[in-house]
Amino acid sequence: MTGTPVAEAKALYEAGRYAEAEAEARTVSRSRPRDDVYGAVALNIAALATGAQGRHTEALATYDEALPVFGRIFGADHWLTLKLRSDRAQEMTSMGRHAECEAECAAVARAAVRGTGPEMARLAAAARNGQVFALNAQGRHQEAEALAREALAAHRERDPMSLVLRLGLARSLNGQARHEDALAEARGAEKLHRSLPDHQRLPQTGAVELAFATVLFGLRRVPEARRRAAVAHDACLASFGPDHRRTVEARTLLERIDGTRP
């Protein structure tokens, strides 16, 4: 995307400057003709950046605006359109719409498996990650574990996708009270997270610390859990704001640890 109308918005997003990325992307989108490729991509960046600021309802509305444009430009079965559907679905789970997210991610994963090429393979992993998160959120931890392991077996790269799948696996194990197994997965995720370049780590700010805090609380290692939860909360608050799903989860965990929330 270097040298294109969306290059600045993309660079701002990758630098974690989400408010600036959103503003730039929306400016580009408004300036482009109807059904223009760069206008469509700008809408996608705007949706991602809005969600990263914890404004999940607005982000979903932006995805809803972008989806028909992507369909007209690229076609319903193109990997970019399918990726947009996956991203949109995962925004739903940030709003508590877990069953809808699960169903849509499953549909995208099926479509991706029918496709060919590395983009479709990455998309299948991304959609399965959305399913794993939604299953965990519904308390269906054994199903989430099975799907996370299947996805990790199919996706061998040590990249951000493997990171989020491992975090989902840790969450599923913790949900089954298999805390030592979950701790091992959290340690693996931490090692992988540290190996990634900065721009790939930013979207998962606080996620590894939150995973550790949740597991340690399950193991009744309360002082360690509280320290990790506080680090996660402060990092998420600084990066994403108070209303982001991960910030809220970290804050809720801190309240549970402190006994102010059941």
Language-model segments: what does each one mean?
Residues M1-P262:
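Intrinsic-disorder-linked linear interaction elements in eukaryotic regulatory proteins
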